[in-house]
Amino acid sequence: VDVKRLVCDFSAEIQNLKWTHDTLSFNTPSIDMLFESTDSTINGALHNEDLSLNFGSQVGLQQFIDKMTKCGNIALEQVNSISLNIDTLQSSLPPFACELEMGKRGIVQQFLGYNDIKMKKLSFELYNDTTIYGDGIIQGIDAYGTKIDTITARLAQVGKYLGYRFHMGNRAGTMDNFASATVKGGMLGSR
């Protein structure tokens, strides 16, 4: 670990985790974590039963933090002036790839279940290389007694335009008033 340069190589494996607090109880056979940071890359991973989270960037941690701070300031300025410029936001973001897969088993799912939320599958990916791209799906949601079969989301940048598509699909008997709903659109700099 080099704290001054924000360079590190960390990995951990937790076996047979059991945690109880009041009425909240978690139990999982293992959690694996990895975080590596060099002057020019970041790699991170978290794996727990059906949960897999992977993150990577082709910049070092200090540059990543600096770029995220700059992007946050640019986004705030654009929101305040009611003028979005997606290509300016994209170019101020650090390059990254983030991928998340989650099934029915794991510590996150136990926490959601404790809060009366269940889902069969969550899959999500978000990238920023030369453009912003994101794609995700949630299947078999049951939240506080409300059931939804499938929700999908997609983001795709083309120049200054960020297109989006959100879809909810349900079979008969599941939220019949919203059996199938799709919202498509985009954001482009405007005043």
Predicted segments with their positions:
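Surface-exposed, low-complexity/disordered segments
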Residues: I82-S92
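Hydrophobic lipid-interacting interfaces of membrane-associated proteins
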Residues: V1-D66, N73-I82, F96-R191
